[in-house]
Structure formats: C-alpha cells, structure tokens
C-alpha cells in the first residue's frame, strides 16, 4: 500500500512506458498524480535510464529518498527485445526520421546474419546517434541535428553480453540483446547494417529488464495512478 509518508521516505516503482511518451512525460505524470493525491507541494521523482519516445517497456522510477538510488539502477545491465529492418537506413537510425537510403538485400543470407551478430559480443567502442539526448556544449545532440547543424558525438565504451536473432520474417529481424549501461540499440542496429555492407533501421524496441527488475513486474502509468 502507498501513503504520503511512504513516498517521501522513498519508493521504487516499475512502469511500462507507452509508445510515444518521453521518459520525462512518465516522471511528470507520476509526480503530478502523487502531489495531487496527497497534497504534497514538492517531491522528488526521477527515472533510471532514458527510453526513446519510439521505445516501450521497463522504466525504473525512483520517488522521494529513493532518488539517491538512481545511479545504481542506471549502472545495471539492460535487456531489450526489438525488430530491425535490413536494407534501409534513416538519419536517426530508427523511424523518427524518414528513410534516406535503400540497399539491395538479394545477397544477404541467414548464416551471415547469425555470424555477424556474434561479432558484436564483448567490449567495444560505440558512437551514439546524432539524434540522441547526449549533450554537446550544453545542448542536446538531437536539437542540433534537427537544425541541420554538424554534430560530433563522443564515442563511449560499452559491452554486449548477449545478442540473439530470429529471422523468420526477413528482411525484418527480431532480436534480443543484453548490454551495459549507455548502449544505444539504434547504433548497434546501424553498425550491424554496416557490417553487412548494407543498411539497417530499428523499427521496434522494448526494454525487458534492468538488472533484477523485469517488465513482468511493471504497471502501466494508469494502473499505478489508480493504485496510489
């Protein structure tokens, strides 16, 4: 059960972020609901790892004194499932922007896809998408990219622990991946396309787990608000 005191002392809740919402949209909605329900003027609410608007799934929300735990949740491994499309690319590496290149997929075979996926296992350097929330001189990279400005994003060290493909609906490829914090799945997909000497675009993404936290234990925003 929830109470005013329990939220102030600290709670961590698991939310299934809906498609089209930003992670901050979820935080704002939950904060507003708690403040209204319990007549609290101010309460800290934050999330432990951004999900893009076009992604769904697990969002760890920390409330009250539990906001001190946010970094520890951010540092945990993440597991995602999703779908990418072989043969087309976009500037954002997903469907936020329109397709800008089309490639022939005649010479792509299933064995090659499986082999390349295994080459991604391990530690590596990744370049985040220019359409990302990474800050460059105080501004978000996506803000600069949308203005058509040149964007140079610093590379980061990541690790892929597991990467599995399901190729039943080629050129759409379903996948599951477990990775370190800070990994951009869009960049993994883009790099996968390049490794094929082709192109690839992320078309669906869902976060399934963050450390021990699992989507199976998450509530929708509406379910949580109705329970407080």
What kind of region is each of these model predictions?
Residues 1-228:
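Catalytic/RNA-binding core of pseudouridine synthases
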């Amino acid at each position: 059960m929830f109470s005013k005191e329990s939220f102030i002392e600290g709670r961590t809740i698991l939310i299934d972020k809906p498609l089209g919402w930003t992670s901050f949209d979820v935080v704002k909605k939950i904060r507003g609901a708690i403040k209204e329900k319990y007549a609290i003027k101010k309460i800290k609410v934050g999330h432990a790892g951004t999900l893009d608007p076009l992604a769904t799934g697990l969002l760890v929300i920390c409330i009250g004194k539990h906001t001190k735990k946010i970094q520890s949740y951010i540092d945990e491994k993440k597991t995602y499932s999703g779908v990418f499309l072989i043969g087309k690319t976009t500037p954002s590496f997903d469907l936020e922007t329109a397709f800008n290149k089309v490639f022939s997929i005649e010479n792509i075979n299933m064995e090659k896809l499986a082999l390349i996926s295994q080459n991604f296992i391990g530690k590596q350097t990744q370049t985040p998408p220019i359409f990302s929330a990474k800050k460059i001189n105080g501004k978000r990279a996506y803000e600069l990219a949308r203005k058509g400005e040149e964007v140079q994003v610093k590379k980061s060290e990541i690790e892929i622990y597991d990467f599995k493909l399901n190729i039943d609906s080629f050129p759409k490829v379903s996948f599951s991946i477990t990775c370190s914090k800070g990994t951009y799945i869009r960049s993994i997909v883009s790099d996968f396309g390049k490794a094929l000497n082709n192109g690839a675009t992320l078309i669906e993404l869902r976060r399934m787990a963050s450390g021990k936290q699992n989507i199976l234990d998450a509530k929708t925003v509406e379910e949580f608000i109705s329970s407080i």
